[in-house]
């Protein structure tokens, strides 16, 4: 991996931005990589748009903005509508299959994770679905090590 650009998007209250902060922390503090994290959200406390953009690299990051992500993590259907067209043609889409039901055509690699169901059944808290999605990202891409991700979550 030289550099991975990703977008994590959902609605307010799902923890999309927190997931980006934790991912960046795992990369920098525990795996010795470079990372940049930016975010945007609407004014609603819950239910509005929320997204984070993360760049992780083995080398210094010269331009700190994601324009064409390698990976889009969609935690809500609205995330697909907003960001699917920004995904690189060879990019990957990771969805919370409990929340996203319509997938756009033309995406070559799609990973479905039933994160909300798993969070509710195993952890008794659907708000932890963001951490389950991060675990899936880590397993699929190895962008950060499992140990680094676990330490960043615990920190």
Positions of the model-derived regions?
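Active-site cofactor/cluster-binding pocket
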Residues: 1-155
